[in-house]
UniProtKB/Swiss-Prot annotation:
Binds 1 Ca(2+) ion. Residues 1-16 form the signal peptide. This is Neutral phospholipase A2 ammodytin I2. Disulfide bonds join 42-131, 44-60, 59-111, 65-137, 66-104, 73-97, 91-102. Keywords: Calcium, Disulfide bond, Hydrolase, Lipid degradation, Lipid metabolism, Metal-binding, Secreted, Signal. SMART domains: PA2c. CDD domains: PLA2c. It catalyses: a 1,2-diacyl-sn-glycero-3-phosphocholine + H2O = a 1-acyl-sn-glycero-3-phosphocholine + a fatty acid + H(+). GO terms for biological process: arachidonate secretion; lipid catabolic process; phospholipid metabolic process. It comes from Vipera ammodytes ammodytes. Pfam families: Phospholip_A2_1.
Length: 137
């Protein structure tokens, strides 16, 4: 039992905000963030450059830009407070930085949900060599 508890604590520490973001994405799309949105287009996944390939990829571009405007905490590791109320994502807590990170994730998850019809499997594992002419935020 103690080993299970230690593993759970370690997983929470490692996943942090990325787990929360993935949970938001699943709630809004019914898709796995890891399987569907990591390494999609030019912006979904680690890093990002080039021109967004479709509306789904643009959600990731806007999310990257939003993270770039967050000051005072690491967006990918920060653990924030949020809930789901009547189908909506509600960010909570008093820390302005954590709320900003939550809002970035909330807006992106909603964007994915609103653009499910643009998701195109041809952009999954899209070669980064095709991502040129980077747009500005």
């Amino acid at each position: 039992m103690r080993t299970l508890w230690i593993v759970a604590v370690c997983l929470i520490g490692v996943e942090g905000n990325l787990y929360q973001f993935g949970n938001m994405i699943f709630k809004m799309t019914k898709k796995s963030a890891l399987l569907s949105y990591s390494n999609y287009g030019c912006y979904c996944g680690w890093g990002g450059k080039g021109k967004p390939q479709d509306a789904t990829d643009r959600c990731c571009f806007v999310h990257d830009c939003c993270y770039g405007r967050v000051n005072g905490c690491d967006p990918k590791l920060s653990i924030y407070s949020y809930s789901f109320e009547n189908g909506d994502i509600v960010c909570g807590g008093d820390d302005p930085c954590l709320r900003a990170v939550c809002e970035c994730d909330r807006v992106a998850a909603i964007c994915f949900g609103e653009n499910l019809n643009t998701y195109d499997k041809k952009y999954k594992n899209y070669p980064s060599s095709h991502c040129t002419e980077t747009e500005q935020c």
